[in-house]
Swiss-Prot record:
Superkingdom of source: Eukaryota
Keyword Flavoprotein set for record: no
UniProt-listed PROSITE patterns: JACALIN_LECTIN
Organism: Arabidopsis thaliana (Mouse-ear cress)
Lineage per the UniProt record: Eukaryota, Viridiplantae, Streptophyta, Embryophyta, Tracheophyta
Name of this chain's protein: Jacalin-related lectin 12
Coiled coil regions in record: none
Length: 459
């Protein structure tokens, strides 16, 4: 076992072993064949030394579904983790698998009925580059090889003066930035980072602390609360080669303008769908240039409360256009989502409309892409063998709130992550009931630009 692998000891079973190795650049395609008895075989294709590499078949195919999950390496997409479900009925085997990349989450492939055990292959700050496992008539075991993710380096913007410095990109996040200004422009900038284990690192200062200046209030980023630094706008004076102003934006808030933004050449550091995790640049008596290290923003799975029959997972999309559900007798029976993917609507239906009596249909429409679904609040009640959802309330990024749809009960749940949009749902249901509801969230640019101002100091 390589030190770059992550062992899945809980389901390592006897059977013919296979090992694709770890000398690959990336995973490109994963093929699965199976049925209600489990995943029968798996085939993984890779990129090695920049060229496609077809992987061998592992297992045996006796018919059933065939599904392929493709990873677009040309768009810098890579495989982050694999989740799955396994059982020991008629010998242990894997019943269902789900893939997560840095850009999206697949639906559950296979059958994930109630009572299956769950496993996960993931290593923070790493991507999957190879697999090994065991398979006979079914896929019995799965393990992965990992390698660290390399952040993207954005070139420094600003003047040509000063001494080069580089904090690197091997951080988990930026947590605080503080600036001091003087009559020349930005005198110094200080950064606080946390490492991959979540521990604070030594503060980094670039520029000069000597002479007259004015230290501004620090700009703090609450990474533990899913706040991320998305971009920095600035300007620099071409004659002096000194950065004059900076303005910071997260998915939750935007700072005031730090310095004088009325003169100089403007620049922006940042890339859509990415967060800034490190900096480099040049400085001497003042800050002359600033560059950044960026990495892809992370999707967050908001787990559901409750339990029930079949587990389902729609995966993730660009946004949600409409939610519809059917209820009667004070119980939500069926829920339907209209998602947006590549500009087209894709509909997913979970639950069923079996039962007695007439059904009431409720709908909530979102003005995507001008509006995002940001919160779902629901109520549920206990029921023998599980839980039953009774009502749902929706909120959007435009501060719209739906009425309570359904019949509220006394137990509540909330699907929300501040500064994030809900881009997919998962849960548990049967042909008669919706038992539980969870979601996926993704950071969005702050829509509230009010209150932005500039700090100017006269000398």
């Amino acid at each position: 076992m390589s030190q770059d692998s992550n062992a899945l000891e809980m389901i390592q079973n006897e059977g013919p072993k296979w090992d694709d190795g770890f000398d690959h650049d990336d995973v490109t395609k994963i093929y699965l064949v199976g049925g209600k008895t489990g995943i029968d075989f798996i085939k993984i294709d890779y990129v090695k030394s920049g060229k496609p590499k077809n992987g061998p078949f592992h297992g045996y195919s006796g018919g059933g579904f065939l599904q392929m999950f493709e990873i677009d390496n040309l768009k810098n997409e890579y495989l982050e983790s694999v989740e799955g479900y396994y059982t020991n009925r008629s010998g242990e085997f894997i019943g269902a698998i789900q893939f997560k990349t840095n850009l999206r989450v697949s639906e559950i492939i296979g059958y994930s009925y109630w009572g299956l055990k769950k496993f996960k292959l993931a290593k923070h700050g790493n991507k999957i580059i190879g697999f090994q496992g065991s398979a006979e008539y079914r896929l019995k075991d799965l393990d992965a090889y990992f390698t660290p993710i390399t952040p993207t380096r954005m070139e420094a913007q600003g003047g040509n003066g000063g001494t080069k410095w580089d904090d690197g990109g091997d951080h988990d996040s930026v947590t605080k930035i503080q600036v001091r200004i003087n009559k020349e422009g930005i005198q110094y900038i200080k950064f606080n980072y946390v490492d991959k284990d979540g521990d604070p690192e030594k503060e980094q200062l670039h520029g000069s602390e000597t002479g007259r200046g004015y230290t501004l209030e620090p700009f703090e980023i609450n990474h533990s609360d899913k706040e991320y630094l998305l971009s920095i706008d600035g300007c620099y004076d071409e004659d002096s080669g000194v950065i004059q102003s900076l303005q910071l934006k997260t998915n939750i808030k935007t700072s005031e303008v730090m310095g004088d933004d009325e003169k100089g050449t403007k620049f922006t550091l940042g890339c859509n769908g990415h967060e800034i995790i490190g900096f480099h640049g040049s400085a001497q008596d003042n800050l002359n240039a600033l560059g950044a290290y960026i990495t892809t923003l992370t999707l967050t799975k908001l787990e559901y409360i409750g339990e029930g029959s079949d587990i389902w997972d729609d995966g993730t999309f660009e946004g949600v256009k409409k939610v519809s559900f059917y209820h009667n007798d004070g119980i939500v029976r069926c829920i339907e989502f209209d998602y947006v993917k590549d500009g087209k609507i894709e509909t997913r239906v979970q639950g069923g409309k079996r039962g007695t009596g007439d059904f009431t249909k409720e709908e909530f429409t979102v003005d995507y892409p001008n509006e995002f679904l940001t919160s779902v609040e629901g109520t549920y009640r206990d029921n023998p063998g599980g839980t039953l959802i009774t009502s749902l309330t929706f909120k959007t990024s435009n501060n719209r709130t739906s009425p309570i749809l359904g019949k509220a009960s006394n137990k509540t749940f909330l699907l929300e992550s501040k500064g994030c949009a809900l881009v997919g749902f998962h849960g548990a249901s049967s042909d008669f009931f919706l038992y539980a509801l969870g979601a996926y969230s993704f950071p969005m640019t702050s829509l509230a630009e009010a209150g932005r101002g500039a700090i100017h100091t006269s000398w």
